[in-house]
Structure formats: structure tokens, C-alpha cells
Amino acid sequence: MVQNFIHLPEHRQCVLHLYRHTLRNSKQCCHSQHLINRIKKITRQTIVKHRYDKSSWSVHFYLQKLYELNHLLIQRDVKTVWNLLTDVSKSKSKSKSKKSSTRSSRILKALQDIHQLKQDKGLQDPQIVREKLILNNYIKREQARNHLPRFIPEEYKTKLLLPLALHTVAMARLNSIHGKLVEGPPKVFLTHTTPMGHRIWFVRSAFNKKKRQSKTLGILIRREKNEGHKRWDYLRQCKSNAYWAQQEANWEQLIENKIVPQFDLNRYLDSQSIGKKKIECPPQLAHWLEPIGYSIQKLNQINADKAAYFRNYKNRVLLNGGQALYFENKSITMYQRRVKRFQQMVQNDLPYVVPFFPGRDLLSTLTKYRF
């Protein structure tokens, strides 16, 4: 008996993969939200409509169309994509489809013209966008101080004010560099992060902060935090279970002896911490509470062992092992090299900086000396 393709796992997996790729490619390769929505709508309608087809030719035809659609999206041929969607879609009449295609073609052409106009003006270049932002901020600031008129010709902005604006930004950068050099070598210090129950100590310096932090250290911190949260959840679960265990024990004693034992459960659970005096559990409740108390002791012992390990690591490796000293010496060496480069820049190039000459402006000079 012929079976529907929807019941074949390999076929379902293939169709789902193609559908996901289509949605992903439409968002990455299309700039029109209208086209993205149309791709999603028609693709989903076609897949749902033909999911019970028994004809291998029909299934093969629509799979080929879906593959062709992904290929056109990667090539960014949006006009052909639109026409392909129009051909596949059966919900509209021919006249309506033709009218919609003509109208959408005009919209697509207008969008493409706008995109091309932006590219011709260079608005997509990050460097030009950054320079225009600096120039606009400079003009607003100077106009607020009544140093510039309200109307400024574009030629003056590009040839006169833009170099001055970039020079102002470079001067602020130069003053920042000088201030940091006056402060001395970058500080090297021990810091810590606090997972549940202990501290992880590590060295922080200019060489291993933010994105330059060791990947191994980041993995260690995330792992310890996850494990610490799990142990904390286990402790809370143990205390919750202890309450119900006490109720079960009280029920047993009430049935057997017609009495309810008086016992401070919170005090007993707190005594299971490391370093505290243990409170003995009454014989009537021991069968229920001692296993939970043992679990709490083991979890607290793991926390104490972790804290002792990282405390010893701080003293053995970071302080006495020379890791902090290594980063301190490295910071001093880096600082001395920066001071030497700064002095060379001040002596050789800084007196001859001219904002209006490319290559001799302050930004180029700072880049030359790696500042």
C-alpha cells in the first residue's frame, strides 16, 4: 500500500531542514520585511497543503522549488524570488497575481534605487559614518558656543571643519593617553568572584581583562557557579524533604504511641553545618531524618573543600607561585615601552602635526605609534 511521505522520518527531516534554511536565508538575505513575510507565508502554506501527497513527482517538484528558492535567496535575486513565489502560490487568480507582481516590482525597484543611492553617497561605509557623526557633534557644540554660523556650506564642512573635528577627538585621545602614563604602570591586583559557598581568586591586570581574559578561567568560573547553584538547590530540597520526613515520623509515633515528639527541626538542620555542634536526633525520628542530615553534611563538606582549595590556590599559585609577580613585571615592561613610544612621538612627530594634511594629522600620528 502506498504510504504518505509525511510518515517517512527521513522525508520529514529533509523538509524541516529546508524550511528552516528558507526562513534563515530570507532574514539574512532580504532587506524587505514584506518579502520576508511573503516567503514565510507561501512556504508554510505550500508545505501544509501538500504534506499528504502520495505522488513522488509532486513531492519532488515542490522540493526542487524550495531548493531553488534558497539558492535565489543566497544569490540575493529578489525579483526572481518574488516571481517564483507567485508561480508556486495557487491561492490567487492570474490577473490578481500579475497586478500584485507589477506593483511589488515597482516597490522592489524603488527600494533597490534607495539602496544604490545610499551606497553611492557612501553612507554604508563605517568610517564615513563615524566621521559624519564626529563632524555633526563638533558643529553642534561650536554653534552652541556661538563660534560657528547656522548655515555652513558643505564644502567648508568637508574641507575645513571635518579636519578640525577629527583633530579635537585626537586631542582628547592624546590627553587621555598622557593622563594614564602620568598615573604610572597599570595596577595588578587580586580579585575574586563568589559562587555559592566560596570565592574564586585570580589575578587582574591590563593583559587579562574583559575580552583578553583567559578562556580557561571563564570556563572554570561558569562551571563553579553552575555547580554551586546546584548544591544550593540540593540543600533547599533536603530541608524541604526534612519537613515532610518529620511529619511522617510524627504520624508513625502518633499511631504507635499516641504521642507527637517535640523536636526543633530548624535547629537540627542548622547544626549539620561545618564547625557547629551537632544535635542528636531522637530515636523516634532518626530513621527519617538522619539520611537527610547526612546529605546536608556532605553538601556542606563539598562547599568547605572548594573554599579551602581556592584559598590554598590563592596563596600557593597566585601569591607565592609568582603569577601575580609575573603580570606585575609584564605590566611594568609594557608601561616602559609605551612611555618610550610616547616620548619619541612627542620629540619627532608631534611638533609637526597639521590637521589639514593627510598623513600628518594627529590621528595618523597616534596610529603610527600604536596609541
Curated annotation (Swiss-Prot):
GO cellular component, one term: mitochondrion
Subcellular location(s) per record: Mitochondrion
Keywords: Mitochondrion
Function: Essential for respiratory growth and required for mitochondrial protein synthesis. Required for vacuolar acidification.
Family: Belongs to the RRG1 family.
Record protein name field: Required for respiratory growth protein 1, mitochondrial
Organism from which the protein derives: Zygosaccharomyces rouxii (strain ATCC 2623 / CBS 732 / NBRC 1130 / NCYC 568 / NRRL Y-229)
Name of the gene: RRG1
